[in-house]
Amino acid sequence: MRVLILGSGVIGVTSAWYLAQAGCEVTVVDRQPAAALETSYANAGQLSFGYTSPWAAPGVPGKAVKWLFEQHAPLSIRPTRDLRQLAWLSQMLRNCTAERYAVNKARMVRMSDYSRDCLNALRAETGIEFEGRQLGTTQLFRTQQQLDAAAQDIEVLAQYGVPYELLSPAQIAQFEPGLAGGGAQMAGALRLPEDQTGDCRLFTQRLAELATQAGVTFRYGQQIERLEHAGGQITGVQIDGRIETADRYVLALGSYSADVLLSLGLHLPVYPLKGYSLTIPIVDAQRAPTSTVLDESYKIALTRFDDRIRVGGMAEVAGFDMSLNPRRRATLEMVVNDLFPGGGDLAQAEFWTGLRPATPDGTPVVGATPYANLFLNTGHGTLGWTMACGSGRYLADLMQGRTPEIDTEGLDVFRYLSPRSVRPHREAA
């Protein structure tokens, strides 16, 4: 079976790897000169198998109003003329109930938990190195209210058998001794010992090398222009003015997936959530994080690589704007100075931004479509690195006609489609 994958971020490359392992003839096409040069380039670096939660949560609408007036708000909304932004925000608000939050979080934990097992198996099989650590995540709560609100998340963790530990303020420094040098006061913490860390770009580029050795063809620097279709099938992809064909097609274009699908009559509610990161050279390892520390107040993660600290987070709903906002850099610097002062050289930090492809319910879109030979793997939001291996393996099983190892409920695009829109779009005569 010949498979054409559109997109060479971590989602596209893991899809290629697992499809190649299943015996498919795989080609990956991307506009960039190498893999992982967009959203996968400098994300927060956390493999948050336990800390997997949708942004759409009870209380978020009220918090969003308050955040409008805060200098270091984790979420900001900049209205655009794109009606899809309004539609996406409306759908997100409808998912901010306790009932929907529980359903969405359970779906996300299902995929994340599976992805941990897939990544561990991949590491054992290939020995792939990506500055990874397996030392857990420590989620910091600055207030008792935050600690109390974590009860619902803990209930879902217990339901899925995800190990966790509640830490008192005195216990936190046992796992992250560098925090002792900061002046921040904490009410407590939630520790997730099975979470991991690693450089997503390194992982993706090294897996692309392994995939190439396994027979996958990567074609970089090529523009994906449109999908051609007829009779409920994709008949080809226009790439740099030429029509390329395959037996099956995988769309893994992140935030740009929705635009490509419009010509097919499919309205995919995937919208870019703009995030920021700083990559900071370590100057004092004793004052740097040991693994990943997540600051619940600012929704910012601080992750340890070999000789660097990656500080990432925040979400701007601002369309496809890729400009670097100095106010966001100030927030990242404020948090790292508060928690790990003196650990890294901020003057030498690399400031970066990327667009996370987010669904309004937080769950990715992985699986079949109304077009028989078109499959999607997108919409992972802030958790693409976390869910990449699980999503790639899950998709490969579906495309091969094998029963996936996890429940398929609620993971594909059909949860968003009305009965009318399930019928393939007909091209104008």
Swiss-Prot record:
Q: Which InterPro entries match?
A: DadA (IPR023080), FAD-dep_OxRdtase (IPR006076), FAD/NAD-bd_sf (IPR036188)
Q: What reaction(s) does this enzyme catalyze?
A: a D-alpha-amino acid + A + H2O = a 2-oxocarboxylate + AH2 + NH4(+)
* Record carries keyword Oxidoreductase: yes
**A UniProt-annotated Pfam family:** DAO
Q: Name one GO biological process term.
A: D-alanine catabolic process
For this UniProt entry, the molecular function terms from Gene Ontology, in alphabetical order, are:
D-amino-acid dehydrogenase activity
Q: Which SUPFAM superfamilies match?
A: FAD-linked reductases, C-terminal domain, FAD/NAD(P)-binding domain
Cofactor(s) listed in the protein's UniProt record: FAD
Keyword set, alphabetical order: FAD, Flavoprotein, Oxidoreductase
Where is coiled-coil annotated? none
What's the superkingdom here?
Answer: Bacteria
Q: What is its EC number?
A: 1.4.99.-
Gene Ontology, cellular component aspect: cytoplasm; plasma membrane
Instruction: Decide whether keyword Membrane is in the record.
Output: no
Concerning its family, UniProt says: Belongs to the DadA oxidoreductase family.
Cited NCBIfam families: PRK00711.1
| Record protein name field | D-amino acid dehydrogenase
Query: Which species is the source of this protein?
Result: Xanthomonas axonopodis pv. citri (strain 306)
